[in-house]
Curated annotation (Swiss-Prot):
The gene is ppnK. This is NAD kinase. Involved in the regulation of the intracellular balance of NAD and NADP, and is a key enzyme in the biosynthesis of NADP. Catalyzes specifically the phosphorylation on 2'-hydroxyl of the adenosine moiety of NAD to yield NADP. It can use ATP and other nucleoside triphosphates as well as inorganic polyphosphate (poly(P)) as a source of phosphorus. GO terms for biological process: NAD metabolic process; NADP biosynthetic process; polyphosphate metabolic process. Its cofactor is a divalent metal cation.
Length: 307
């Protein structure tokens, strides 16, 4: 007896291309007896540019509408994403909770995290139906806020942890510590702690290097630091990075992947380590990361002759 198959579809709704691509996903999965699960916030009445469950059921698609909570992807084999990097990061959280792969199809601008572009959706669906994809484990970060030695908040990140000063506030005074030893104290707009996956995102814009995603490391990037030694550092993946906020300064904020926000009171401490739970990444493209880097950033390679 064939096991019941189900895919969670996460879509950046509200645009024609997303709806058209989602309709194609619905038809192909339905034709192949693969059930579809969609998020309640993306499932509204007919006539909108969102997903319409009643229309799908009328076409013979088995569909379930669920809330976007920690159990949204339970029982699914894959999370399929139609959107840009922001949508992918939202979907990655759901996939991580269920320990299943996430596969991105780009409908945004750069879409660095996506595995394919929208025009390749038929080829993508062939791989999904055949379960023909590789799965990579991507390093994630565990984030802890301590105040007076007590944990007051915690979170996680796939791309980066961004410590930032509050809006319209002065320079943020911090001390950066690695593996229990102080490295540098300075004033800044913030500090980024990034994974290799996130090195092409905010950390790159802040002056950090690009790290190949199969490299196991943690990247620390001061953001507009007023310091002689305010340079990016690449640490061991097993390092503990701590950032202490000056006690006589002001509160700060931490953003995990630009989505989950935490308050960092003055005098408290932010600790970032490798998380034991990774994000499972479905890969279709066998091309090296170098090709993706050149393609997504449109890097000039004219004149290259090779061997």
């Amino acid at each position: 007896m064939t096991a019941h198959r189900s895919v969670l579809l996460v879509v950046h709704t509200g645009r024609d291309e997303a709806t058209e691509t989602a309709r194609r996903v619905e038809k192909v999965l339905g034709d192949n007896k693969i059930a579809l699960r969609v998020l309640s916030a993306e499932a509204v009445d007919r006539g909108s540019l969102h997903l319409a469950p009643d229309d799908m059921r009328a076409m013979g698609v088995e569909i379930e509408v669920v809330d976007a909570d920690q159990h949204a992807a339970d029982g699914c084999e894959l999370v399929l994403v139609l959107g840009g990097d922001g949508t992918f990061l939202r979907a990655a959280e759901l996939a991580r909770n269920a320990s299943i792969p996430v596969l991105g199809v780009n409908l945004g601008r750069i879409g660095f995290l996506a595995e394919a572009e929208a025009e390749a959706i038929d080829a993508v669906l062939e791989h999904v139906v055949a379960q023909d994809y590789r799965v990579e484990d991507r390093l994630t970060l565990d984030v802890v806020v301590r105040q007076g030695g007590r944990i007051v908040n915690r979170g996680w990140a796939l791309n980066e942890v961004s410590l930032e000063k509050g809006p319209r506030l002065g320079v943020l005074g911090v001390v950066v510590e690695i593996d229990g030893r102080p490295v540098s104290a300075f004033g800044c707009d913030g500090v980024l702690v990034s994974t290799p996956t996130g090195s092409t995102a905010y950390a790159f814009s802040a002056g950090g290097p690009v790290l190949w995603p199969d490299l196991e490391a943690i990247l620390v990037v001061p953001n507009n630091a007023h310091a002689l030694f305010g340079r990016p550092m690449v640490t061991s993946p097993e390092a503990t990075i701590a950032i202490e906020i000056e006690a006589d300064g002001h509160d700060a904020l931490v953003f995990c992947d630009g989505r989950r926000e935490m308050l960092i009171p003055a005098g408290s401490r932010l600790e970032v380590t490798r998380c034991v739970t990774s994000v499972k990444w479905a890969r279709l493209d066998s091309a090296p990361f170098t090709d993706r880097l050149v393609r997504k950033f449109r890097l000039p390679v004219t004149g290259w002759r090779g061997k």
